[in-house]
Amino acid sequence: MDETIYPGIVSCLGLLIYYFTLYQSGMARGKFDVQAPSHEGPEAYQCYVRAHQNTLEHLVLFLPGLWLFAFAVDHIWAAGIGLLWPVGRLLYALGYYKAPEKRTIGLFISMPPIYIFVVGALIAFAMKVFEQL
């Protein structure tokens, strides 16, 4: 079986979580009567917008990190560790929608995979370079 299937599934889950926050941010416009293109509105509306924007900011690091780690280290490990990111981002968004201080647990779950992926891939690639010397 092609091992890229597993990080591929995790990538799709990450994109679905991003789309969920995008959708929720759009729905919040109607809920809080904020007309496009404005992002000004009540604090509750801002929580929806920030959950979406922050997820986008992290997605840019998560997806390439996931795939770099998958190719440099292991596809299965990448997928297993990577599952933490969509779960954490979902908890982050749902918490943020309730109150800003309730986003923390989701952030703490979703951040480590990014660090593990980037640092792990860098170490693995460096080791491969040194093996060739």
Over which residues does each language-model region extend?
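N-terminal signal-anchor transmembrane alpha helix
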Residues: 2-33
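Membrane-embedded alpha-helical transmembrane segments of multi-pass integral membrane proteins
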Residues: 14-17, 21, 84-92, 113-123
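Core segments of transmembrane alpha-helices
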Residues: 54-66
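Alpha-helical transmembrane segments of multipass membrane proteins
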Residues: 65-68, 90-94, 125
